[in-house]
Structures are given as C-alpha cells and as structure tokens.
A protein has these predicted regions:
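Soluble, non-membrane globular domain cores that form compact, hydrophobic packing
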Residues: 9, 13-286
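Positively charged n-region of N-terminal signal peptides that target proteins for export
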Residues: 1-5
Length: 286
C-alpha cells in the first residue's frame, strides 16, 4: 500500500498544475529598484491588465503573467511583463501575432526585437515584453540590459518552431511567419496552422502547413470539401484544388501528417512549384 501511495504521489508531482512553471525571479539590475509588489495574473484575471487583448492571449493557451516595475534615481521606469504559455509553440504564436516583420531584430532568446521604448522577445514558453519611460538617449541600452538579465533568469533560450525551416526560402518575406492556433481561414474544423507571406515578381501569396495525425488530416479534407460543396471523391493522400467562397481557389496537398497549401495565386505553374518546394522542405524535417 505504501508503494502504491508513493507512486501516486510521484505522478501527481510530475503532472500537477505547476509542473511546467519555473520558479522565475525578476533580476536585480544595478541602479534600479523594484517598485511595489510583483503582480500576477492568470487566465480569468488577465483582462484586468490587458482588457482589449486578453482574448487573443487566451487563444494561445496563456497560463500566467508576472509584472514588475523598476525605477531609477532619475525617475525613469521599466515595466517587465513575463507571459507564460502552455508550450513554446503557443508562445511563438502570440509573439508572431504582435511582431512587425520590419522591426529591429536582436539576438536575445529565440528571437527578439527592439524599438523606441519597447523590447519584446521569445524564450521557450515565455513571451517577454519590456516598456520603458523617461529613459532618454540611453533607452535601447537600458532595455537590452534588462532583457539579457531576464533571459538569463528564464534559462535555456529555446528556438523558433522547427517546422518553420520547411518553408521555401525563395520569395519569403523575412519574419512574416505566424502560428494560427485555432480556426484557420475562419473554419473551426481546420486545426492550427503555420503560415508565411511571399512575394515573387510582383505576385503576393501565402503558404501554410497544418500538422495532425493521418485521421485528423483526412477529416479536415473531407469537411473542407463538404463546406465548399466540392465534389467528394475517395478521400486519399494527394493534391486537392478547392474553390473557397471566401479565399478563392486554394491548392493544397495532403501527405502523412501534413496538409500544406498556397493561397492567392492563380498561376498554376507557380502553385505547383511552391507546393513541390514545400514538400521537399517537409521531407527534410523527417
């Protein structure tokens, strides 16, 4: 009986609600002091801090937010927001929704960028946002110093989702990749998807990839055909061209656990080219 209780205790410890959370501590920064208490927000209270944006964060499996404010003798301040999401992919998702593709990117965490009075970065399951006030000409230096110390306290920096390396490089707009967690293209039956924007010879288009198991992929194809009133043939792996009333003609390919496709392109040769390039990229990922 004691052995059973011990095993159950270990299981509860490993899989309990706090198993994924690190014991994060805000860093000490020379010349700065924390002002007031650290604020903590959970899913049901997040709206108290970011009312208008809370729903978007919750879509990406937000778990917890910790907020600290620092002041110096010159009455400048830095506010550090540390958002924890359920997985690194979810953290990337919300980060990708807010980053600007032409931002001033820096080597911090998995990726980060700095603008006037703002520094945001991604590291593991954490999305960190820093805002500065009255920091003057030293603003960027101050933000970088804070970011490095916060990143060190969070530990391993992680990396961007590996599947992003499968996207063809030719024509891809740098840092345009996004992760859509739910309702891709506005359809509840389409699971989460990674996307990237492209431009080639004046033609702008988008590539996407959805990852599931074989049954999940088959169900998505079948429901998409039903939704668009497309002819329902024997659902099998291969190429599909779907006339979507909201998104135009979409060409996609299903193979194994992936569905990948292309949007906003009428040139069939260009579609074929990029679907093949994408297939090659996914093969390398295996």
């Amino acid at each position: 009986m004691k052995t059973v209780c011990l095993v159950l205790g270990i299981i509860i410890f490993l899989w309990g609600p706090g198993a994924e959370a690190k014991d994060f501590k805000f860093p000490e920064v020379t010349g700065w002091k924390q002002s007031g208490e650290i604020q903590t927000f959970i899913p049901k209270t997040l709206f108290e801090y970011i009312d208008g944006a809370a729903d978007l964060y919750l879509m990406y499996d937000f778990q917890e937010l910790k907020v600290a404010e620092y002041l110096n003798e010159k009455k400048a301040s830095v506010i550090v927001d540390v958002y924890r999401h359920k997985t690194p992919t979810q953290a990337f998702g919300i980060y990708s929704q807010e980053r600007l593709s032409d931002a001033n990117f820096i080597n911090i965490g998995a990726q980060g960028y700095v603008e006037k009075n703002v520094l945001n970065f991604l590291t593991g399951s954490y999305y960190v946002k820093l805002n500065s006030f009255n920091t003057g000409a030293e603003d960027e230096e101050i933000l970088l110093n804070f970011a490095k110390k916060v990143s060190e306290n969070l530990g391993e920096k992680g990396r961007l989702p590996f599947i992003l390396s499968s996207f063809p490089e030719e024509g891809k707009k740098k840092n345009s990749e996004k992760f859509i967690n739910k309702n891709f293209l506005g359809y509840s039956f389409l699971y989460s998807a990674f996307t990237a924007d492209y431009e080639l010879s004046g033609t702008k288009f988008k590539l996407f990839v959805i990852e599931s198991d074989r049954k999940g992929c088959k169900d998505m194809i079948q429901k998409y055909l039903q939704q668009t009133k497309s002819p329902e043939k024997n659902i099998a792996e291969g190429l599909y061209t779907i006339s979507d009333p909201y998104h135009g003609e979409i060409e996609l390919h299903w193979q194994g656990k992936y569905i990948w496709g292309i949007l906003n392109v009428s040139d069939t040769s260009l579609r074929s080219k990029y679907l093949k390039l994408f297939e090659v990229g996914l093969e390398k990922k295996k």
